Amino acid sequence: MDKLIVLGLLVVGALHVGLRIVSAEKLELVYQWSQLRDVSRGAALPNVVFSSDSVNNSEDTFNTYGNLPMGVTHHKGFLYVTIPRRRPGIPATLNVIDMARNPSVNDPTLSPYPNLLVNTLRSDFAADPKRIISVYRTQVDRCDRLWFVDTGYLEYPGGAGRQVQRPALWVIDLTINRSVRRFEIPPEMVEFGWGIPNIEVDVDGSDCGRAYAYMPDYEQRRLYVYGLSEGRMWRFEHNYFSFEPRYGDFNVARQRFTWYDGIFSVALGGRWQESSTERTVYLHAMASVSEIAVSNRILQNETLAQLGNGVYGSAFRHLGARGPNTQSSSHAYDPITGVLFYAEVNRNSIGCWNTNRPFTPDNHGIVHLDNDEMIYPADLRLNRTAVNYRIWRQSAFRAAAGTICE
C-alpha cells in the first residue's frame, strides 16, 4: 500500500492571483481554517486553547494573525501541527488534531501536545527543560516516536526576540504521550537554534535504539547529526550547504523579496541494492535549485565528521539542477514509488522526481500547481472571512500518476 503523505500545510493571504492551472482533484482537502481562534474567549469558531500562565499582557492576548501553522505530520489518525512562536500570543507551539473527533473539513480543534503545561511559557521567561518554546516541523519514525527541535527562541519582531533556553532535540513516545529523550544542543555545536527548520529521522523498525536524526541549519549552513544510542551530536559543513545567489530572489503572490537561506531540507531516500542499511540522503538549500546526495553511512560516522570537510567533502554529490523557479522548502521521499516530492515556493506547486531516472529538469514534473490556494507562507495580510490555512493529502502513487515521475 502507498504511504499516505500529507503534502503540505500551506498559508494563503488575502491576495488571490492567477487561475488554477492544475485541478485540485489530485489532492484531497483534509482541513481548512479561515483563522485560528481562542477557545477560552468564547469565539464563534473556537479551535485552540489559551494558557492562563501568561508571560505579559501581549502573551495573554490571543494573536489571531500570529498563530500561523507551519508544519504538519500525520500518524495513525492524528495530525501534529506546529505553530512557531514568531509573535506573542501563541498558546501552544506543538498541537494535535484527533481526526476521528474532527470529521468536518472546517475548523478542526487543535489541542496542545502533549499537554498545555509543556507548551506554556513561564511568566519570567525562565528556562525550563520540561517546556517547549518554539517548534517548526516534526517527524514520526517507524517506532511511533515524534521527533522535533525546540529552537528555544522567541522570534518576536522589533528587537523583542530572545533565547529563552538552549535549543533541544525532543523525542516523544506516541504510545504513552511522554518524552523519552531530550538532548540539549551544546553551544559549541550552535549558538542559536532558530535556523533549524526541519528534521529527518533514520531508523530501522527492527532496532529502535539505533536511530539518527539529521537536522539542517539554514543560517549557519551546517548539517547536524544526532545518534540516539551514542547520545551525542556532530556536524558536517560543506559549500553545497550554502545558498545560490542566482536563486535568492522570490516572488510569492506578487510580493518580491530576497532570501539567503542555506541547507533547509533533508530527505531519506531508498536503500542501496547491495546493502540492507545504506541509503541515499537528499538535501538542498532553500535559495537554490540544486539537489545534493550523500550516503547515510557518511552522516552516521562521527569520527569522519570530526576530521573535517577535507576528508569527507567528496562524499557529497551535486546531482544537478531541478529547473527554473523550483526553489523548495521541504521535500519527502516515498519508498514504494521511489519518487521525491518537493514543496516549490516560487511557483506554488508540489514538484516531483522519480529517483530511478537521471536528475535532469526534463525528468522533474509537477504534481499540483495552484496560484489561488497553494501560496507559500509569507508576510501577507490575512483575510478574516476567506480560507487562509489548508491541509491536503494524497497517496504517493496517485499523486505521481500521469506525470513524468510515474
PLM feature spans:
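Short, solvent-exposed loop/turn segments at conserved positions within beta-propeller repeat blades
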Residues: 86-91, 157-166, 218-219, 277, ...
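Short loop/turn segments immediately following beta-strands, especially the blade-tip
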Residues: 98-104, 228-233, 294-307, 353-360
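Conserved beta-strand positions in repeat-built beta-propeller and related beta-rich domains
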Residues: 81-87, 148-152, 210-219, 281-287, ...
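N-terminal signal peptide
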Residues: 11-32
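Surface-exposed loop and turn segments in beta-propeller and other repeat-based domains
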Residues: 34-61, 106-130, 180-192, 235-258, ...
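Asp-box/WD-like beta-propeller blade repeats and closely related beta-sheet repeat scaffolds
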Residues: 125, 129-132, 152-209
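Beta-propeller domains
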Residues: 25-62, 76-121, 157-163, 170-175
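Beta-rich, blade/repeat-based domains predominating
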Residues: 62-76, 127-146, 188-213, 242-281, ...
